[in-house]
Amino acid sequence: MTLIATTKDLDALTMVVVAEFDAGIEQVWQLWADPRKLERWWGPPEWPATFTRHDLVPGGESRYHMTGPDGEQPGGYWQISEVEEPTRLIVHDGFTDEAGNPAPGDPVIMEVTLDELPGGTRMTLTSTFASAGQLDEMVKMGMEEGLAGAIDQIDGVLAEAA
């Protein structure tokens, strides 16, 4: 795997992460479609994810939490808006409160695109924020480093599936 680039665009209110993998597009798609594979890489190594619901269809929803080094378990949700298997999906990604309900605030819109390459697949994650303040807040929370750490785990998951 090669993390090609991470780019923040304050004018467009986006953060784009591009990575390439030595695996076919269907295999990379399964990293998103299979909740057991997804939870093996979604989140940095020190904050593993547990998906309690994962309905990857338009109008579907995913619920998850991450477990931190001190046992804290912040929750998150995805509202699935578009699915074009095996090349594209769009989710609204937000935090949940302690009861598991969507927390106040605008979710981040995350678009995932997968493109076939000779001998592999390019994955592009484009996160679009509601405001510059939201983008800044997520950067301060470590989103950029967290995504890089998460993506670094993908090769191991792909190797086991091969």
Predicted segments, located by residue:
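A generic structural micro-feature
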Residues: 9-11, 56, 70-74, 102-106, ...
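Hydrophobic/aromatic beta-strand elements that line small-molecule binding cavities or substrate pockets
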Residues: 19, 51-54, 76-82, 107-115
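Hydrophobic pocket/interface hotspot
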Residues: 28, 38, 62-64, 80, ...
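Short beta-edge strand/loop motif at the mouth of beta-sheet-based domains
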Residues: 16, 36-75
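Hydrophobic ligand-binding cavity/cleft-lining segments
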Residues: 1-48
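Beta-strand/loop substructures that line and gate deep hydrophobic ligand-binding cavities in soluble
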Residues: 18, 92, 99-145
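Short, highly charged C-terminal tails/helix-capping segments
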Residues: 51, 158-162
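A short, structured loop/turn motif at beta-sheet edges
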Residues: 25-26, 56-57, 81-88, 113-122
